[in-house]
Every structure is written in structure tokens, then in C-alpha cells.
């Protein structure tokens, strides 16, 4: 065993571990066992699988390596609940996850309890610091799956003709709000800046190493684009004007017949929007941020508006000094909130955190000197650095402890089952009018 770890650090990590594991179960509480078997699109996974896979991660990368005498809960589970770690073991195709009715939900819950007990025993014996680092990684991994759970539940319920409601609004909650204020642009001077993780806590390998980049002066919209503004793009024929679209994006919308964001349904001359809180009208949600759009749709809207999407480094430079606070999972609103609910903070950007992941124009690539984790954990991020775009800022279903200014989410540009939206950017001339940072 290497150098010891302080008791307070172990206690703090134990509390964090229990909190994360409890929240995952709380997310599943409104579901029936039948709900937890559904896999409604190729990108999604059944809720039952998420419960098992997150336990598998702790068992496979922590308990097997660091808890003396640990015995697997089930010899078949390492294969059955592996996601994509090819150097670890073989695994079933993702599309087959809903095909396995066994093990049943009760067995999965027993598996989780068994793993929980193992982690707690490990924390009691003052583990190797590497074990603590992996437990923190496992907690962050599970927080990612909490978000995926909710986006997968939303899609599963949307495909059900009965349109179930995951969680109705409380009596003091709704989507109605005053009209959003006109879009304003906040100017930033750019220059030579440092980007990447700089703190002493946890981060993913794709946030490192910290390095310098050059930014020309730029401006960012003070808030996200609303449903009302996106509806204007639709009404103006945005989905019929090929000149607004990247070639691959035009192919995607034509092949799929897309003429609006996911979860929008035409009702005569208006629209309804389906959410985790149930169905609502466009009129009611007009000033909430538009969500569930692809990178291609975000890019086409920006071109239609005469603007562009920000780079990931423009976003990070603007967000680095801003405290993490907003419509995140901890707020339990579970859908992008009306823009007027975000406080008007003068020359500060609003809605940086939560509501919707913000598409950037940056391809997902390794930073100069990027080094993946050793062993099978090196497959966590690095092997996906091809054909994906970076998103920043978190969403309404991102746990608040999970997000930070250097956090890099990434998805294929045709992906839209996540809470993904738009913040516009623009170029500026140095020393022009308006706020500068």
C-alpha cells in the first residue's frame, strides 16, 4: 500500500459516494420495472442497464484491484455490463441492451448494494490514493449516467403514445414567464489565455494539459436562444434553405425529414413541446431556451442570424471566473427554464451553467500533450476524439458538482437527444463600444 490518506478525506469521499449512488436510485423512483427495460433509440440505454453499468464500473476498476479478497457478485456481469472498454473484456452490442430481461431489477439492485458495501469496506481500511482517485472518477462517471438516465427516460416516454409524465410540475412551478429581453452581446478582448483544468480537484484527462491559446476579440450573446427565436427561424423557412446548412447537415435533415427540434410537434399553426414535466405549448415555453437540436441545426440558425457559434476556448475564457450556479439538476426544474428566470446581471453572461449544453464550433480533439489514463481507463475519453463536436456549460439535468469551466462534453454533430442548445458569438473590433472583459 502506498502513502496513507487522511481520515477526513475518506469520510468526505464516503459521503460523496453515498450521495451519488442515492441520487441515481432517486432518479429511477418514478419508473415502473417495465419503464426500466425500454431502449427507444440507438443512442439510449435502458434505465436498468444504467443501474448495473455504474455498479460494474466501481467493481471492475476499483474493487477488483484494491479490495483484498473481493469476489465478483456474478461471473457473467463483467461481460454483460461493460459499455465500450475493449481492452477489459468483450461486451454485447449496445443495440441489444434492452433484449436481456435477465438479470431482473431485483438482482440489479442487490448487485448495487453488494458493490456499495465493498466500496465502504475499502474506504474503512485507508486505501491506496489511487483507489480514492478511482472512486472519485466512478462518482463522476455515475453523475454522467444520471444525466443520460434522464435524457433516455425523456426519449422513451416521448415514443410512448400515452406520453407519460416523468414528474409533473409542482404547484409553484410552470413554464410561463415575462418575455425575454432582447439579445445583447458582451465583448471580450481575447489575447493569449490559458485554458484547461487548473484546480487541485478532480478533472477528466481530456481537460488536460492546461495550455495557452490565442483569441481574437469576440462577443458572446448574453443568454441562450429561445424557443420563440428558433420558431422564427422555422417560420422563415430555415429548414428549406440549403444555403444555411453545412452539406452533411443538409443531408441529415433531408434523410430524417426534420423540420423542427426533437420533441416539437406541429399543432395546426403552432407547436407543442414534450418535456420531462409533460407536454406544453410553444406559447407557454416561448422564452425557455431551445433544446434538443443538433450541431448542424445550431450552426444553421447562427448563419441565419448573421452570427456564428463560439469556439470552446472563447466559451471557457468567458466562463472561467463565473461561479457555477444555474438551472442544473440540483434545481430540480428538469427542463430548460424561461430566460427571464435567469437574473439580469448587467454586463455578465447569463445561463452559462445549466439549461442546455451549448454547441461550440470546436471539434473534439486532444489538447497539445494530451495523455490518456493508463490501462483500460485510457479508453474513457481519448478514443472518441474523432467526428465529434464539443459542448460546454451543462444542462438542466447535469449535477452541479459535476460541471466546471474546463469541462468538455462531446457528441456527434447529428446528435440531438441530449439537452443541447445555442449561444451565439460574433467577431468584434478591438476597443469598440459595449462591455469588454
For the regions a protein language model found, what residue spans apply to each?
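Inter-helical turn/loop segments and adjacent helix faces that build the functional surface
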Residues: 122-133, 155-164
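Short, structured coil/loop segments at alpha-helix boundaries
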Residues: 67-70, 74-75, 126-132, 246, ...
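Disulfide-stabilized, aromatic/cysteine-rich ligand-recognition loop
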Residues: 2-23, 27-45, 49-118, 132-147, ...
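Functional-site microenvironments in short loops/helix caps that host divalent-cation chemistry
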Residues: 138, 142-144, 148, 152, ...
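A short, terminal or domain-edge coil/loop segment
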Residues: 91-95, 124, 184-186
